[in-house]
Design a protein with these regions (language model features):
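Exported/periplasmic ABC-transporter solute-binding proteins
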Residues: 1-276
Length: 276
């Protein structure tokens, strides 16, 4: 039975079992937001603990990870949706499989001292287009809203522009209101001007990480608080898939194709239940 199988043995079609080792594990790359998931995946497949496999998950972020795949320096990418121009490059080459495997949510966070507990999707859009500028307009204190954004090309920024703004042009943020990293953005919202003026976004996976979420409050959107259940049920409004991507010519018996099939199969990872 399964108990006798070595760690990480996965079905490779038919009755064949394939055992992943450090020697045959495909080179992984991806987004900041999928790195925790990839670490959990490596731990399961290699039968090692999370600390041991951390060195195998050295992710170069969404845009760069797809470029690495196209350049041949990564075998399998687990990432947020690529920015439109990167997607165009992938599709132009016609040789990359890009398949959704899990859903994540874009969540909005404020300093925990901010009395506002929720916004509507429309209010969020109006804040980011500059139509709503003060927290008092959405039931909060008389305080200017400081809406942070991520850098262009970041997975969460692409998701923000697609699922939140729906084509509306966000205002050009001052340089001090953008952050080049997820951690930087959360720190900014936590500490900006020692006040509760800031608003920012991250993915559910990160907002669920206790260390990351320290001092922050996640807002309900349209009355729905993001939770694993609300994401799975599709009730929370700001959802987007994560993708797994490989070379479509990877042979059926290659570790890359076997891992791709495993990610998409019933044993594969889901984001709605963060590990640990």
């Amino acid at each position: 039975g399964p108990a006798s199988e070595p760690p990480g043995s996965v079905s490779a079609g038919g009755e064949e079992m394939f055992v992943f080792t450090r020697d045959n594990l495909p080179g992984l790359d991806g987004s900041t937001s999928t790195a925790p998931l990839a670490r959990a995946m490596c731990a399961v497949l290699l039968g090692e603990d999370l600390d041991q496999v951390a060195e195998l998950v050295n992710f170069s972020r969404t845009t760069q990870s797809f470029r690495n795949l196209m350049a041949g320096t990564a075998d399998l990418v687990l990432a947020a949706e690529p920015a439109p121009e990167v997607l165009a490059e992938l599709e132009g080459e016609g040789r990359w499989l890009l398949t959704p495997f899990a859903t994540d949510a874009l969540v909005f966070v404020v300093n925990r001292d901010n009395p506002v507990d929720g916004l509507t999707a429309d209010q969020v859009r109006k804040i980011y287009t500059g139509e709503i500028t003060n927290w008092s307009q959405v039931g909060g204190e008389d305080l200017e809203i400081v809406p942070f954004q991520r850098n262009q090309g970041a997975g969460s920024q692409t998701m923000f522009e697609k699922v939140v703004m729906e084509g509306a042009e966000p205002m050009e943020p001052p340089a001090t209101w953008t952050s080049n990293s997820m951690e930087g953005l959360l720190n900014a919202v936590r500490e900006y001007d020692n006040s509760a003026a800031a608003l920012g976004y991250t993915v559910y996976y990160y907002a669920n990480d206790m260390e990351m979420a320290r001092g922050l409050k996640v807002l309900a959107i349209d009355g729905v608080t993001p939770s694993a259940q609300a994401i799975r049920a599709g009730e929370y409004p700001f959802l987007n898939p994560y993708f797994v991507s490989i070379d479509r010519d990877a042979p059926p018996d290659s570790p890359t194709r076997i891992l791709y099939d495993w990610v998409l199969g019933p044993a594969g990872p889901t984001l709605a239940a963060p590990e640990g």
